[in-house]
Protein backbone atom coordinates (compact mmCIF):
# COMPACT_ATOMS: atom_id res chain seq x y z
CA UNK A 1 0.00 0.00 0.00
CA UNK A 2 1.07 3.60 -0.59
CA UNK A 3 2.09 5.48 2.60
CA UNK A 4 -0.71 7.72 3.86
CA UNK A 5 1.66 10.65 4.35
CA UNK A 6 2.60 10.69 0.68
CA UNK A 7 -1.01 10.51 -0.52
CA UNK A 8 -2.18 13.11 2.00
CA UNK A 9 0.51 15.50 0.77
CA UNK A 10 -0.74 15.00 -2.77
CA UNK A 11 -4.31 15.57 -1.68
CA UNK A 12 -3.39 18.76 0.17
CA UNK A 13 -2.00 20.23 -3.06
CA UNK A 14 -5.07 19.14 -5.00
CA UNK A 15 -7.36 20.41 -2.25
CA UNK A 16 -5.72 23.83 -2.30
CA UNK A 17 -6.17 24.12 -6.07
CA UNK A 18 -9.78 22.96 -5.81
CA UNK A 19 -10.46 25.45 -3.00
CA UNK A 20 -9.12 28.38 -5.05
CA UNK A 21 -11.18 27.30 -8.04
CA UNK A 22 -14.25 26.83 -5.83
CA UNK A 23 -13.91 30.33 -4.36
CA UNK A 24 -13.60 31.84 -7.84
CA UNK A 25 -16.72 29.98 -8.93
CA UNK A 26 -18.68 31.13 -5.88
CA UNK A 27 -17.73 34.76 -6.51
CA UNK A 28 -18.82 34.47 -10.13
CA UNK A 29 -22.16 32.94 -9.12
CA UNK A 30 -22.82 35.72 -6.60
CA UNK A 31 -22.11 38.39 -9.22
CA UNK A 32 -24.44 36.71 -11.68
CA UNK A 33 -27.20 36.57 -9.09
CA UNK A 34 -26.91 40.29 -8.33
CA UNK A 35 -27.04 41.06 -12.05
CA UNK A 36 -30.14 38.89 -12.49
CA UNK A 37 -31.96 40.67 -9.64
CA UNK A 38 -31.43 44.16 -11.04
Curated annotation (Swiss-Prot):
Keywords: Ribonucleoprotein, Ribosomal protein. One of its GO terms (cellular component) is ribonucleoprotein complex. Initially thought to be part of the large ribosomal subunit. Crystal structures show eS32/eL41 to be a small ribosomal subunit forming a bridge at the interface of the 2 subunits. Component of the small ribosomal subunit (SSU). Belongs to the eukaryotic ribosomal protein eS32 family. This is Small ribosomal subunit protein eS32. It comes from Methanocaldococcus jannaschii (strain ATCC 43067 / DSM 2661 / JAL-1 / JCM 10045 / NBRC 100440) (Methanococcus jannaschii).
